[in-house]
């Protein structure tokens, strides 16, 4: 079953005569259970592609489909909700909220979503990541 798909994804930056085509009709399909590596030289469009797949940027044309939902057609509010509930994105230079402790940084997206915090689930994340000694309340 396809969990992620792009169809003729194009991303262009700039204006004539200085247009840069970062993605040029990229079509991929990733099925459930597959492991995929995106590799390429500097400037080849890897980060641009990941930004499209993560819903952080919109394509100039083409479609991005995650779990049968065409995310490239969502408005900003819909995309924010979809991304918060369905996509995990780890940035190369991640930024935690410095005034929050470890626990507060972990539960922040749950609180922003207005969802109930499952303390057992949060505890399992903390244990899995080995962050018990970093908790300061």
Where are these regions (language model features)?
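Conserved ABC transporter NBD signature motif
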Residues: 62-70
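ABC ATPase NBD coupling module
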Residues: 17-20, 71-88, 112
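Short coil-to-helix segment of the ABC ATPase nucleotide-binding domain corresponding to the Q-loop/switch region
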Residues: 100-108
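Conserved ABC ATPase "signature" region
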Residues: 69-70, 117-134
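ABC-type ATPase nucleotide-binding domains, specifically the catalytic core motifs of the NBD
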Residues: 14-16, 107-118, 128
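Helix-to-loop junction immediately C-terminal to a conserved catalytic motif
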Residues: 54
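The feature captures the beta-strand-to-loop junction immediately N-terminal to the Walker
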Residues: 39-41
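A short, flexible loop at the N-terminus of ABC-type nucleotide-binding domains that lies
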Residues: 3-6, 12-25
């Amino acid at each position: 079953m396809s969990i992620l798909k792009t169809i003729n994804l194009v991303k262009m930056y700039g204006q004539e005569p200085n247009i840069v085509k970062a993605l040029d009709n990229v079509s991929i399909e990733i099925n459930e259970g597959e492991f995929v590596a995106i590799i390429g030289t500097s400037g080849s469009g890897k980060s641009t592609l990941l930004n499209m797949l993560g819903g952080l940027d919109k394509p100039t044309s083409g479609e991005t489909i995650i779990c049968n939902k065409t995310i490239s057609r969502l408005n900003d509010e819909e995309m924010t909700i979809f991304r918060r509930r369905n996509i995990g994105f780890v940035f190369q230079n991640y930024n935690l909220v410095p005034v929050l402790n470890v626990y507060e940084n972990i539960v922040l997206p749950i609180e922003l979503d207005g969802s109930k915090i499952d303390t057992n689930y949060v505890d399992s994340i903390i244990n899995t990541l080995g962050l018990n000694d970093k908790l300061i309340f």
